[in-house]
Amino acid sequence: MIEVRLFATLREGRGKIVMLPAEDYPDAASIIRHLEIPFEEVAILLINGFHKKPENEVKDGDIIAIFPPVGGG
């Protein structure tokens, strides 16, 4: 299984943590598409704590963290 952790507005309608079968998702992009997250809403993508790109491969046991752009002021 792949653990996907969502943050801030990405949790809306999806939850905080989503578990997905590794064999169905060859890369982070396929997970982002499955969760119906527009790519422009992905500001930071971490795989096992390391900054990665959506085309990076994922495997069983990976922890994916997806953060949206954050504004403030």
Segment roles from a protein language model:
Residues 1-72:
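Ubiquitin-like/PB1-type beta-grasp interaction modules and other compact soluble beta-rich domains
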